[in-house]
Amino acid sequence: MIGMKHVFTLAAVFAASWCAAEIALVPAPRQMVAGEGEFVRKGTSVDRAIYDFSADAAVPAEGYRLKVASSGISVAAADERGRFYAEQTLRQLAEERKGVLAFPCVEIVDSPAYRWRGALIDEGRHFFGKETVKNVIDLMAYHKMNVLHWHLTEDQGWRIDVPGMPELVQYGSWRKSSPKHGAKLRHLGKFRYDIEGNGQKYGPFYYTEADLREVVEYAAKRHITVVPEIDIPGHMRSAIAAYPHLTCFPENITERSAHTMWGISTDVLCIGNDETVKFLEKVFDFVCDVFPSEVIHIGGDECPRANWEKCPRCKARMEKEGFTKAGQLQGWITRRIAAHLAKRGRRIMGWDEILADDAPKNAIGQSWRTQGGNGAGTTLVSGAEAARLGYDMVMNPHTETYYDYRQGLEGDPFQYPGGMIPLDRAYAFDPCAGVVPEARRHVLGSQAQMWSEYIWNEYDLAWKMWPRACAMSEVLWTAPEKKDFSDFLRRMRKHRRRLIKMGVNCAPLP
């Protein structure tokens, strides 16, 4: 009997050591030393009762120290965010057995590489609803991501109910038809497109004020800041459906519904119209009331300017301001809204187009273009150049971070617009590529971009987001010198099983 007892003990130790060697954390921590044995606790959930906590101001912001010994678990952090991220690590370490949780013995010292670790969800083209958004928030938190960029307005749909402006959802939250699933968008010329429609009404879909506040509160409990985007002065066809007088040529607005075509509508806000300014100030006041984020995204991308060049009111504004080019009107409205938001203690963020027209120096730029001819053809100020000029930047080159692009999977059942970002390309992304060392402090981070022209529902969304957003989480959290794609794939084999067990429609690994 004594001999059998020793055999059992050795087997248990071997099994525990094997589990420690197979630790698979995503994103990878800054430092980790695996130990021998494990800590076992009754129960099936990771909560604050399972560890001892100590506040330590020496730990970096959002960072933590974690020690799992056979006798218990201890966590140290300087702030609640660090404590929360330690708990996410514990959730990934936990192995559920019959009525107990087992944690491999390990010591971890961890903190993020970047401050801005985000994901964009586009609900202008397709609407997913708050439960799907909450699910995305849960998964972001699980991967230590901290910014949800919520794209709430588009040519194809207006998704927020603004008090005193019922027409926005009455006319802007639905469209009479949508592009047919599987149909391909054809470019017929500058800002001219064609695609087969399905003839089916889409919507009305929108969020009430209570819905918006619920999502903001839900995210805050998970240490995620919700940054709302109201895209101006282009991508506004849904608002123009509600208020045709806000565009340069109202007589051209014959359909009082959102845009039915993918691509960019040439109907944009009239910058020469004082009513446009009043409208935007009222919308952004509501946004400030609902969203506590210091940063408010004002879009600014892909704005066609042909109507401004012909519009008498825009011409009058140009003459009054001494402008020689219609494009300067975009800089004017950017600065006007930035000043208005500054009165509310807020800071604007916009796509890189805003940087070409003298944006305020405290504006945050979001670099998406790789060449100046993209979008509306505005002068390209690259992310690296903008950082050198002193702008804080979120780096999002579409060739690296637009996860609505194809994944390179054989037999992929979902539709994509084009482009290719396989998992290894997503993982190789460097937000500081090309940025001179002295300007890297201005690179806040990056985010996964989930544009929804070809994302039709929550299953489609999850498939395209994960596992590439796992790669993004590691790009933004893990120290660059610690990154290793082969090791990431090894960890992802186990981590993907976790995600699937959680109900995530995670795409296969290569």
Predicted regions mapped to residue ranges:
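Active-site neighborhood of glycoside hydrolase catalytic domains
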Residues: 239-245, 249, 257-363, 369-385
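Flexible loop/turn segments at secondary-structure boundaries
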Residues: 127-129, 155-161, 233-239, 297, ...
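Flexible, acidic glycine-rich loops studded with aromatic residues
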Residues: 348-353, 358-363, 367-510
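Feature activates predominantly on carbohydrate-active enzymes
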Residues: 60-267, 271-295, 336, 340, ...
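Generic recognition of stable, solvent-exposed alpha-helical segments in well-folded globular domains
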Residues: 132-135, 207-214, 275-282, 328-336, ...
